[in-house]
Regions:
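ANL superfamily adenylate-forming
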Residues: 112, 118-167, 182, 277
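Conserved structural elements of the adenylate-forming
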Residues: 44-52, 167, 186-208, 216, ...
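Conserved AMP-binding/adenylation subdomain of ANL enzymes
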Residues: 194-212, 220-261, 276
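Gly/Ser/Thr-rich phosphate-binding loop
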Residues: 237, 260-265, 274-335, 347
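Conserved AMP-binding/adenylate-forming core of the ANL superfamily
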Residues: 27-72, 76-80, 97-102, 151
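Conserved AMP-binding A3 loop
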Residues: 39-41, 171-195
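AMP-binding/adenylate-forming catalytic core of the ANL superfamily
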Residues: 96, 113-115, 256, 263, ...
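Conserved pre-ATP/AMP-binding loop-to-beta segment of ANL
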Residues: 27, 156-175, 182, 206-212
């Protein structure tokens, strides 16, 4: 296994490692949000003050603190400050409900919640219903005299030395998607953060201190955390943070004004950007590289966007369990429509339902082995043992690999369709549909007909909604038939105005399947 990075000492604190790496960059901007800049010297000071503030409020090593925070400079301060103190930060999605936050507070047994003032009212029912003592820290304006001001923690004398943490010690949690039940508390170590930067951020993205990075994916996601904290701070780069939702116009404003050199997006955002009238010209930008993850990037979208902006999009596959991307395309060797090849330091295996390796070109379950794998799911033994199998992690994704070692996404394990006795990848059908110039977005699901057989059904968003009619449906069916095996074409095509999506922009196929049942 290729691994150019040094081995970590047993005693290791990732926050301290970042602060030490950037000690000589004190005057350089580390983070720039919508309202202020934060230099590396200020980051160092605030992180150590926040760490001291946590301890002053009685937080103990490995106790959890829930972070319900929008992307401002306070979020990296809170995250790194908790790591520095040996406390476990748990950044969570800011678009959830009070019920979701209530579950996470109880499940994590968090002793403190740090919340942005704009979200304070949303979490209030969860805080009120919390069955254990909980301290509430508010970033921004206080709404009452019971809450603790974020600024008061920063007023503490800085903690002189970090907590004596082990490289493999519980460092932080991320909650994985709960589309099939309650979200899982995915526990990661200090070492996991280090390895994602050493194996992907530095060698694959070639990040350096001269880069300015901007991630549309928020810091509470594994993808966003690496994009906008782990990787740039590991090389002394500057990060642009955006608190609002990543609409095309909001993204364009930052791309034009802040001139990032590296941009991280998701496929649905790239589609929306291409369709927007305000899409900037190449000479308005300073991009040298774009990255895509979250779901497979359609080949046509990758080719069109890269041609417009003049740089590659490196599509890849990552997961909350592996913390970031472990399969990736490379600059100068991009094959759009694939997830690329294994990131150095990671190994892949494709297996059938019996655990046997599949042949080149055949669909199999993807397993990953690498040093950034999560330690476990908190308080979920059955799910932990099903996912973390010795050195291997079962991804839940179906993939194929070609003779050149490029991996192509075939869908989630529960999305695969069996039509006429043969497996059909919905991603393959979607890619064929996306090649038609009238198709803006699409999603393919399986529907059971009156005979109990599965047929392929496509939901399509057109560039021009007026073109949605039976004739266009037949044109698209014929178009797919000419590109794929006959049994794979969609038997039904439904035209809709927009596809249901998660907060990260992933298409919610289960909602389309529910429509079918009706």
């Amino acid at each position: 296994m290729q691994n150019a990075a040094p081995q970590l000492p047993q005693r290791f604190n990732f926050a301290q490692d970042l602060l030490a790496l950037n000690e000589a960059r004190g005057n350089k901007i580390a983070f720039r949000d919508d309202h202020c800049d934060l230099s590396y010297a200020e980051l160092d000071h605030r992180v150590r003050c926040f760490a001291a503030g946590l301890l002053a409020h009685g937080l103990q090593p490995e106790q959890r603190v829930l972070l319900v925070m929008i992307d401002t400079v306070d979020l990296p301060v809170a995250f790194l400050g908790a790591l520095y103190a040996g406390v476990v930060p748990v950044p969570v999605n800011t678009l959830l409900t009070a019920e979701n936050y209530g579950y996470m507070l109880t499940h994590s047994d968090a002793k403190m919640i740090v919340v942005s003032d704009a979200l304070r009212s949303t979490v209030d029912p969860a805080v009120s219903a919390c069955g254990h003592p909980l301290k509430i820290v508010v970033s921004g304006a206080l709404a009452n005299d019971r809450d603790i001001a974020f600024s008061s923690l920063l007023a503490q004398p800085p903690m002189p030395q970090p907590a004596d943490t082990h490289a493999d010690q519980f460092a932080f949690w991320l909650y994985s998607s709960g589309s099939t039940g309650q979200p899982k508390g995915t526990v990661h170590s200090h070492a996991n953060l280090y390895w994602t930067a050493e194996l992907y951020g530095k060698p694959v993205l070639a990040l350096n201190e001269h880069d300015v990075v901007f991630s549309a994916a928020k810091l509470f996601f594994a993808y966003g955390l690496g994009n906008a904290l782990t990787f740039p701070l590991s090389v002394g780069a500057t990060v642009v943070l955006m608190s609002e939702r990543p609409t095309p116009n909001a993204v364009f404003a930052r791309l034009i004004k802040q001139k990032p050199t590296v941009f991280y997006g998701v496929p649905t955002l790239y589609v929306a950007m291409l369709a927007a009238d305000a899409l900037p010209d190449r000479d308005q930008l300073k991009l040298r590289l774009c990255v895509s993850a979250g779901e497979a990037l359609p080949r046509e979208v990758g080719e069109r966007f890269s041609a417009h902006v003049g740089c590659d999009i490196l599509d890849g596959l990552g997961s909350t369990e592996m913390l970031h991307i472990f399969l990736s395309n490379r600059s100068g060797a991009v094959r759009y429509g694939t997830s690329g090849t294994p990131v150095p330091g990671y190994e892949m295996a494709l297996r059938d339902e019996h655990g046997q390796s599949v042949a080149v070109g055949d669909i199999g379950d993807l397993y990953i082995k690498g040093p950034s794998a999560a330690l476990l799911y908190w308080n979920s033994r059955d799910k932990s043992t099903a996912t973390f199998q010795g050195e291997w992690v079962k991804s839940g994704d179906k993939y194929t690999v070609d003779a050149d070692g490029y991996y192509s996404y075939a869908g989630r394990s529960d999305d695969m369709l069996k039509v006429s006795g043969q497996y059909v990848s919905p991603i393959e059908v979607e890619s064929a549909l996306m090649a038609h110039d009238q198709v803006l977005e699409c999603a393919v699901v399986g529907q059971t007909d009156v005979d109990g057989l599965t047929k392929t059904v496509a939901y399509v968003v057109l560039h021009e909604s007026d073109a949605a009619n039976d004739e266009m449906a037949n044109i698209l069916k014929a178009f797919v038939k000419n590109r794929l095996a006959p049994f794979k074409y969609p038997r039904e095509i439904h035209f809709i105005r927009e596809l249901p999506k998660t907060a990260t922009g992933k298409i919610q196929r289960f909602k389309l399947r529910e429509q079918d049942v009706g």
